[in-house]
Curated annotation (Swiss-Prot):
GO molecular function: protein transmembrane transporter activity
Subunit field text: The Tat system comprises two distinct complexes: a TatABC complex, containing multiple copies of TatA, TatB and TatC subunits, and a separate TatA complex, containing only TatA subunits. Substrates initially bind to the TatABC complex, which probably triggers association of the separate TatA complex to form the active translocon.
Compositional bias annotation for Basic and acidic residues: 128-140, 149-160
Species of the source: Helicobacter pylori (strain J99 / ATCC 700824) (Campylobacter pylori J99)
Protein name according to UniProt: Sec-independent protein translocase protein TatB
One GO cellular component term: TAT protein transport complex
Subcellular location: Cell inner membrane
Amino acid sequence: MFGMGFFEILVVLIVAIIFLGPEKFPQAVVDIVKFFRAVKKTLNDAKDTLDKEINIEEIKKETLEYQKLFENKVESLKGVKIEELEDAKVTAENEIKSIQDLMQDYKRSLETNTIPNHLNEEVSNEEALNKEVSSDESPKEVQLTTDNNAKEHDKEKEHV
């Protein structure tokens, strides 16, 4: 048990019987057995607690791994959203630039009383049609079409 053989245990028992006497010896043996059982139970409880703690540490490590994985996924999703927002921003900036170009074109045309560049093609087509129509129509009708064109141009000025 404690590195003692049978003969050594027998010597200890004989000394205990002589020292305690035959009346107190049985109670002392019961107390010693209870003490060793309590120590054994305490050691087993400590072992179980240690095993639980080790298991908790493993669970903590696993939880941290999942947390890191989750954070990485969230960051990757943020990256995707940011890229999509950047694309939308670039598209919006391009649209704003084209609208600003149109506004500048209108302002220049208003200052010089000419037709905006982007409308030149449309107007040249309309003028060609008007010339064809004007040869067949009377001067009064040609005057009406030019008045309508002037009204449309005035409406465009109001929107700007």
